[in-house]
């Protein structure tokens, strides 16, 4: 493997950092990792046994001292390499979680010879020690940042190695096919049978296409989605926004044109972090301010992941006065379903912001529209880096299916290189730094 110089530097140092979030809490953790971790813990911790004399996987209760000054009481957890998170000797000190206590405990570890860890350096060391591959390291960050159950579940799958295993299955098929091609090219006089490569390459292509199709759901589940509420004045946009939120966020009146500027509100829908955008009603108007709001609404629809087009089901149906961007993904709603229907449309969902009728079905429809056909029980691609490597691998496999053996072999080598980059087995010098740059100190 190839690593960036900045990733390799200082790997023999013993590092320390606060591993819990800033602010006051019941418990705080200071993590120390490296060749002198247990020696440094000896200088900080006083109990019935020294950390350096304690087997791995044990914890001690005692006092934390800076020379003769008592800092706090707490626990010291001992992990011995290579059976630790980083693959090195690790001491984790658990104290009361006040900033003052954690600051003094961390300062004491630095006085005893530790260096302040860089962002993500503990997980970087786990990766370099072979405890994690690069997709699992990215999943660690995903778990730290997960704000919804879907994001948590996907990150947990990634950390378990589920994504790596999906990739490994494709890589094994490509490796076998490449070996057969190389045998044909290297020993034609031996009469090596021409193994049919069409079926395994088609299978690999299908697997990569399925994996690539999960990228949209992976991005949505981690970064969130924007939903624009679009419709004529008094179609019920603001009422629906309030109903989905469960509280009054947007002003609702019977007067057309009440909403002139857009309004945003966040919530979780179908396990996805969603930003709802309430927009101005679409109509032709001489009012300059309202006209600006209409133009803005159309622009917001073009930038949304999903557009909810609301039409008043209690009034004669009218087409929108403005066409939506052709790239918009649209979900049509027939609103005010609690009132007598002036029209019906099986392609539109019936909803009522007053009674709540249709809202559960709407939430399910939003989830289906955002997550598509991605199988919830399988690991998805969740980062742009992962998506790019799979896209490159797919391009090379598609090319290999149409080329003669010598050129097909080259394409398969490139596909395998892309998959190895995905898991971090063969990675460019700047990729590792780019991944770990997003981590916080202490992880």
From Swiss-Prot:
EC number of this enzyme: 3.6.-.-
The cofactor binding remark recorded in the entry reads:
Binds 1 potassium ion per subunit.
Source species, domain of life: Bacteria
Q: Which residues bind GTP?
A: 234-239, 253-259, 278-281
Residue positions binding K(+): 234, 253, 255, 258
Annotated keywords: Cytoplasm, GTP-binding, Hydrolase, Magnesium, Metal-binding, Nucleotide-binding, Potassium, tRNA processing
Q: Where in the cell is it found?
A: Cytoplasm
Q: Which residues bind (6S)-5-formyl-5,6,7,8-tetrahydrofolate?
A: 31, 92, 131, 443
The UniProt record gives the binding positions of Mg(2+) as 238, 259
Q: Which family does it belong to?
A: Belongs to the TRAFAC class TrmE-Era-EngA-EngB-Septin-like GTPase superfamily. TrmE GTPase family.
Quaternary structure? Homodimer. Heterotetramer of two MnmE and two MnmG subunits.
Q: Kindly provide the name given to this protein in its UniProt entry.
A: tRNA modification GTPase MnmE
Gene coding for it: mnmE
């Amino acid at each position: 493997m190839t690593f960036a110089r900045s990733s390799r530097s200082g790997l023999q140092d013993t590092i320390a950092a606060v591993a819990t979030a800033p602010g006051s809490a019941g418990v705080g953790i200071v993590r120390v990792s490296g060749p002198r971790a247990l020696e440094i813990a000896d200088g900080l911790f006083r109990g019935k046994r020294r950390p350096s004399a304690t087997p791995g996987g044990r914890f001690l209760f005692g006092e934390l001292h800076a020379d003769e000054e008592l800092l706090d009481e707490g626990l010291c957890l001992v992990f011995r390499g290579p059976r630790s998170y980083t693959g090195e000797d690790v001491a984790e000190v658990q104290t009361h979680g006040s900033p003052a206590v954690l600051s003094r405990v961390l300062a004491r570890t630095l006085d005893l010879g530790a260096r302040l860890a860089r962002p993500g350096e503990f997980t970087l060391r786990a990766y370099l020690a072979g405890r994690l591959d690069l997709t699992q390291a990215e999943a660690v960050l995903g778990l730290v940042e997960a704000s919804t159950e879907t994001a948590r579940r996907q990150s947990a799958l990634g950390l378990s190695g589920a994504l790596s295993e999906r990739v490994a299955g494709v890589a094994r098929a490509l490796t076998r096919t490449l070996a057969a091609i190389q045998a044909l090219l290297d020993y034609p006089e031996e009469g090596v049978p021409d193994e049919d490569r069409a079926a395994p390459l088609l299978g690999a292509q299908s697997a990569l296409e399925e994996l690539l199709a999960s990228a949209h759901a992976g991005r949505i589940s981690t970064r969130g989605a924007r939903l624009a509420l679009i419709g004529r004045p008094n179609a019920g946009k603001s009422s629906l926004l309030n109903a989905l939120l469960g509280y009054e966020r947007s002003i609702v009146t019977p007067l057309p044109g009440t909403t002139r500027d857009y309004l945003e509100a966040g919530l979780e829908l179908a396990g996805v972090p969603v930003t709802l955008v309430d927009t101005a009603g679409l109509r032709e108007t001489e009012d300059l301010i309202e006209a600006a709001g209409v133009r803005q609404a159309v622009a917001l629809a073009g930038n949304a992941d999903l557009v909810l087009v609301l039409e008043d089901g209690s009034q004669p149906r009218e087409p929108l006065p403005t066409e939506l961007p052709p790239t918009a993904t649209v979900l049509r709603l027939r609103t005010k379903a609690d009132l007598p229907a002036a029209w019906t449309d099986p392609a539109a969902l019936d909803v009522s912001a007053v009674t709540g009728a249709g809202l559960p079905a709407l939430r399910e429809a939003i989830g289906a529209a955002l997550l598509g056909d991605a199988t919830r029980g399988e690991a998805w691609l969740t980062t742009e880096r992962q998506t790019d490597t799979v896209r490159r691998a797919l391009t090379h496999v598609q090319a290999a299916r149409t080329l003669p053996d010598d050129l097909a072999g080259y394409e398969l080598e490139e596909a395998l290189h892309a998959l190895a980059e995905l898991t971090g087995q063969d990675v460019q010098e700047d990729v590792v730094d780019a991944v770990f740059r997003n981590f916080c100190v202490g992880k």
